């Protein structure tokens, strides 16, 4: 069985953003997400966030958020649209993601 488990962004040498880092910068991260059309931001697991991507946004907007979030946190961040949650074989951490 395969899981939906990787974002469409090039790999980096940064460590994945841990929960403490994401929560410590949560207010800034939520504001950054809103600027990029992402709401209801949630922490899934190290380096993995889930959010509601606005209908008028696309994969390039998501990638722009990931790049900006990496710069803010100094750590790897991948964003998964909450639209994937209804798909088969979704990784359990995405389903169990908790609000930032």
Question: Whereabouts are the PLM-identified features?
Answer:
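Short, aliphatic-rich beta-strand segments
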Residues: 46-53
